[in-house]
């Protein structure tokens, strides 16, 4: 697939977990961007499940609900209106509510919480993570000399501790990596 696109089965539900990594050291993410809007549109058209997680020092669930596809007996225009309204509502919800409550960022715990929302779901499973990649708490705390650590050694250590998040069969979209404020 080309950059920014995913190949999702059109006849399968979409299960989307969004990790919002709003933090003091990163610019605010635009939840109306093309990739997330496309994923939300596909979810709202095909039905599935939406999970929203805030990645702060104690990651928490913002939202987790099933999303029904529009009634097929409606006109295509009406279905499009319903889908667009749902996409706009989801983006607005994230923009307004993705606010850290706890200092720091525990990326591993946030990804694990998001992965729980995808476990056991049949169909397309997608994790969309909007964060700068700097975890400052939990098992992958970059303030503890991890910036220069060998990535394979970090992954091995996370696995040995039982902290390697299982994303088998999940499409992963990362946005905002390396974006830091100031």
Residue spans for each PLM region:
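VWA/integrin I-like adhesion module and closely mimicked acidic/polar interface patches used
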Residues: 134-182
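Von Willebrand factor
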Residues: 8-123, 125-128
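Second-shell loop/turn segments in exported
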Residues: 19-28, 93-104, 179-182
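C-terminal region of N-terminal signal peptides and the immediate post-cleavage residues
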Residues: 1-9
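Short acidic, S/G/P-rich loop/turn micro-motifs used as interaction or catalytic elements
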Residues: 22-27, 58-60, 119, 134-141, ...
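Well-ordered, non-membrane alpha-helical segments in soluble/globular domains
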Residues: 29-39, 107-112, 145-159, 182
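Sec-exported extracytoplasmic/periplasmic mature domains
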Residues: 40-45, 112-123, 135, 139
């Amino acid at each position: 697939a080309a950059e920014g696109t995913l190949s999702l089965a059109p006849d399968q539900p979409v299960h989307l977990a969004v990790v919002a990594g709003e933090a003091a050291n990163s610019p605010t993410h635009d939840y109306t961007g093309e990739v997330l809007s496309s994923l939300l549109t596909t979810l709202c058209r095909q039905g599935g499940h939406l999970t929203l997680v805030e990645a702060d020092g104690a990651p928490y669930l913002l939202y987790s609900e099933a999303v029904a596809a529009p009634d097929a007996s409606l006109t295509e225009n009406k279905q499009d209106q319903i889908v667009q309204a749902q996409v706009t509502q989801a983006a607005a919800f994230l923009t307004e509510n993705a606010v850290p409550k706890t200092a720091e960022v525990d990326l591993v715990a946030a990804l694990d919480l998001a992965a729980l929302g995808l476990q056991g779901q049949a169909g397309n499973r997608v994790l969309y993570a909007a964060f700068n990649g700097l975890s400052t708490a939990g098992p992958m705390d970059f303030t503890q000399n991890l910036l220069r650590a060998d990535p394979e050694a970090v992954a091995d250590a996370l696995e040995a501790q039982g902290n390697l998040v299982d994303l088998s069969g999940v499409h992963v979209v990362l946005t905002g990596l390396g974006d830091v404020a100031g």
